[in-house]
Amino acid sequence: YTDYRKDRPMVAMWSQDWTLPEVPAKQYSDKLISDAKDFSDEAVITITRVGGEGADLPTNMKAKGITYNNNSKDYEDFKDGEHFLQLSQTERDMIDLVTKNFKKVTLVYNGANAFQFDFLSQYPQIKSVLWCPPAGQTGFSALGEVLAGDVNPSGKTSDTFAKDLTKTAVFNNTDGTAAGNASSVGTNGKFTYDNADDLTASYMGFSGDKVTVTPTFVNYVEGIYVGYKFYETAADEGLINYDDTVMFPFGYGLSYTTFKQEMGKVSYKNGKISFDVTVTNTGDKAGKDVVEVYYNPPYTDGGIEKASKNLVAFEKTKKLEPGASQTVKIEFDDDDMASYDQKDAKAYVLEQGDYDISIQSDSHHVIDHQKVTVKDTVTYNSDSNTHNGDAVAATNE
């Protein structure tokens, strides 16, 4: 398998080969599958994606300038309009083969970017998904310990996993191809300047074709509504059906055990909000849990832009044996709940009103909540009264 493709694809800043080397399913022999079933009644599937700051991921794998070599002459891995963060045909065929032969399957996703897991509902045999971002020097040893049950996972998702990435705000706001403004390199995120022709550059791509690029830019029209702040606010406003849109929320993560979190009385004194959370391991395996604290600020239609869910604090427990408890102390400043007013105050503002403070299992599911009331509006617009310890007061440029 390691010799399947010796010239491994590379994604770098100046040139990218997006090929996903994968053995076609028909090359898996009956004996190989039989031997695997004799070894274990559980199977592990690994899906991998590269991607970092060096290059934007393709929103259309068939776009001009995208270098990709299919794994078979019998079919194409991607159809026109399919993107890099969804299954290739070879991967889907492999999953079909594995799930036909195993009733218990774990899928490991090795990649830094949120993958499109909409296919999971089609495979009830896939019992669990493990997100393993770029693992570095020792990460895969840890992965083995988690899979074997020697280590109880306690991580949480650092992004929202959408069911259809093509319908997300960020996908559409950075997709130059969809807007008809794609540069000739054919990747996403590109709106070209119309006065920078003298800065155009050309180079030879992996495919041997000449690739021409020009300076580009992106319109960040989402404002503050990025990631979970968009999904939670959009759901609260009735813009989206959350369950139809989100696969895994921000801050979501499973364990081999179960926990109970109990929220103590919230205190608000001298600009500090504090309370205790008692976490109890209610399962039968030792493990750690994460306390996630969110706030929902008062909002006036047409006023300062605010998200309805905002992560303000989090703490992880020590390793708790079954039945054991730990009380976690939560404390944060009230100016952590301030919002930036770019229209009127042109500064951070902590508006008066009721703020909902909640402990949650992720960005969407509330365990318990209480209210704190800010009596007077505070505007952080002077060097003697800056927001959250800023050296100078933030303001519009």
PLM features: what roles do these ranges have?
Residues Y1-E397:
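C-terminal non-catalytic regions of proteins with extracellular/luminal or membrane-system context
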